[in-house]
Design a protein with these regions (language model features):
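N-terminal hydrophobic/helix-forming segments and targeting peptides
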Residues: 2-272
Length: 272
């Protein structure tokens, strides 16, 4: 696991895979893992490929007298958290996210709870037991099994955002790029993209290609433009996202490359 702020182990694992394929490999002060690979030619400014190491998760901020844990989270909607299993700290202490039982709620309490009204139950009977498990100020990640769905073309897992992007970059590093390229495995994306900002300032790329997951809403109740994009419909090359308008020439070039190589692509019909 590599929750935002605790990505180092994931970075070290990836570094062990890609080291034989890099001309230069290092961690910057932000925590980004940066790989440089010499291409067939050297442009005025290098190309940068980018995918983030971190996943959504939690940090334990307080231990209650009864041994339950309060937490902070980033990058998630609170209503999806209840009943989720988590693993806390280096010792992977198991816990479950809980709130007041719905059959005991009254009035506004029946509304979806916010994280301030949730806690993690680790089975401790009191604060002393919880402290002995070394969970205070530790990171917590979801405890989900990697599951293959259907005919094997779909999977269910935590951290798909953005370990799939990391895997694509690992594969790219096994070949020689057309141009001198940096491959940046960034930290802090779920906290606002702090790692990516630091990498751009250091590398000063002419072109940056971000390999990310995105929103698909191809559900039975959604039709046409409300689907955003479809799982299995090909790689998504959007024209814009929230806060970002992509260079039209670069978008067109990516679409042309896809057509020339028989690669299925789609765009997003909504900014989501």
């Amino acid at each position: 696991s590599g929750v935002s702020g605790d990505e180092r182990r994931v970075g070290l694992l990836i570094a062990s895979f890609i080291k034989p394929h890099c001309d230069k490999l290092f961690f910057d002060r932000t925590g980004n893992l940066i790989a440089f690979k010499k291409g067939r030619s050297t442009p005025k400014s290098p190309v940068m490929f980018c995918a983030h190491l971190d996943e959504v998760g939690f940090m334990i901020r307080h231990i209650n007298d009864d041994g339950s844990l309060l937490f902070e989270q980033a990058g998630m909607m609170p209503e999806v958290l209840l009943s989720k299993r988590v693993l806390i700290g280096e010792n992977k202490i198991p816990g479950v996210i809980c709130s007041k039982p719905v059959h005991l709620t009254r009035g506004k309490e029946k509304e979806p709870p916010q994280t301030d009204n949730m806690y993690i139950d680790i089975g401790a009977q009191n604060a002393k037991q919880a402290k002995n498990l070394d969970v205070y100020a530790k990171y917590a990640a979801f405890d989900n099994a990697f599951t293959v769905l259907g005919d094997g073309t779909a999977v269910c897992s935590k951290a798909i955002d953005d370990r799939f992007g990391c895997q694509v970059m690992i594969r790219l590093l096994s070949s020689v790029p057309e141009y001198d390229s940096y491959f940046v495995f960034t930290v802090g994306e779920e906290l606002g993209g702090t790692g990516a900002l630091a990498a751009v300032r250091y590398i000063k790329p002419g072109i940056a290609v971000i390999l990310e997951s995105t929103t698909a809403s191809d559900l039975p109740q959604n039709t046409g433009g409300n689907k955003v994009c479809s799982v299995g419909g090909g790689a998504v090359v959007p024209f814009m996202d929230g806060g970002t308008k992509y260079d039209e020439r670069l978008v067109k070039r990516l679409w042309d490359i896809a057509e020339e190589n028989g690669i299925r692509v789609q765009t997003k019909s909504r900014i989501a």
